[in-house]
């Protein structure tokens, strides 16, 4: 079995999760300006030092937990990165040479989230439709769905799988968000009823922090929200329903371009 599978079993046996384990990194060596900024914007309060303890981001000796390390501005966890590519066409056959846009991001999960959403926004178009008294905005992708899918990828990915990172791949007709690690409970998402998925959390500390920052709801899964947002789009058709796929070591969300193949 791959080493990450053995590590998963060890953690399971200890009733511990990756994000709560203490790292070798000292809290005092890292800045958390993005986290502080977001906390202030969301709650209206400055982030007090003691919150780093109650958020389980550091231990009593001043060492960061893995969750803390993942949220440091300059995160020392090197495989926490985001690769974004806008491919030319419907697949990757043209290769990177032909890619229309590409970027790689590292740092705090908050940076990855913001940069990922910005990358998608700059690579999509918005159409307008005139109605009797106003005009309707029709973007290629529902920004809320992109946001939810990326939060999901960053928070629920398996950080024990090294040499793999989160990818956003944009094609002419769709975009995919890929993350290492299948469903935390070992099931296959494509065989499940999305409306009844209980949130088994691979990284409960990260999920809790993102909940406190207003990035995700404490209860329930983002899958339903991704699909509902799509269905509510002005230019939605049934064949454009978002697709979810997982296997033992990966998870992928496909969001379809709502304007692809339709007359302008």
Protein language model annotation of sequence segments:
Residues 1-164, 170, 186-188, 192, ...:
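Active-site helix-to-loop segments that bind/position phosphate- or nucleotide-bearing substrates
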Residues 73, 180, 256-258:
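Solvent-exposed residues in well-ordered beta-strands and their adjoining turns
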Residues 172-181, 185-186, 252:
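Short, highly conserved beta-strand within the GHKL-type HATPase_c fold
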Residues 65, 172, 246-250:
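Short Gly/Ser/Thr- and Asp/Glu-enriched loop/turn motifs at secondary-structure junctions
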Residues 26-28, 78-82, 90, 187-189, ...:
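Flexible, glycine-/charge-rich segments associated with ATP-binding catalytic modules
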């Amino acid at each position: 079995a791959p080493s990450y599978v053995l590590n998963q079993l060890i953690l399971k046996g200890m009733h511990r999760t990756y994000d709560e384990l203490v790292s070798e990194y000292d809290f005092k060596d890292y800045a958390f300006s993005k986290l502080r900024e977001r906390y202030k914007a969301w709650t209206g309060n400055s982030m007090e030092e003691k919150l780093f303890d109650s958020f389980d981001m550091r231990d009593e000796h001043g060492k960061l937990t893995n969750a803390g390390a993942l949220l440091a501005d300059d995160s020392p966890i090197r495989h926490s990165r985001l690769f974004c590519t806008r491919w030319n066409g419907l697949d990757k056959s043209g290769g990177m040479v032909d890619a229309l846009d590409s970027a790689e991001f590292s740092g705090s999960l908050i940076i990855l989230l913001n940069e990922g959403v910005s990358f998608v926004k700059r690579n999509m178009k918005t159409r307008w439709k005139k109605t009797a008294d106003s005009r309707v905005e029709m973007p290629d992708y529902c920004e809320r769905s992109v946001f939810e899918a990326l939060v999901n990828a960053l928070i629920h990915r398996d950080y024990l799988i090294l040499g793999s990172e989160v990818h956003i791949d944009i094609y002419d007709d769709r975009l995919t968000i890929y993350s290492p690690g299948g469903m935390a409970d070992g099931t296959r998402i494509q065989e499940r009823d999305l409306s009844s998925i209980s949130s088994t959390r691979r990284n409960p500390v990260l999920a809790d922090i993102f909940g406190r920052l207003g990035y995700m709801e404490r209860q329930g899964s983002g899958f339903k929200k991704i699909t509902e947002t799509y269905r509510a789009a002005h230019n939605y058709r049934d064949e454009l329903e978002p697709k979810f796929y997982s296997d033992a070591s990966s998870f992928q969300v496909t969001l379809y371009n709502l304007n692809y193949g339709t007359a302008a």
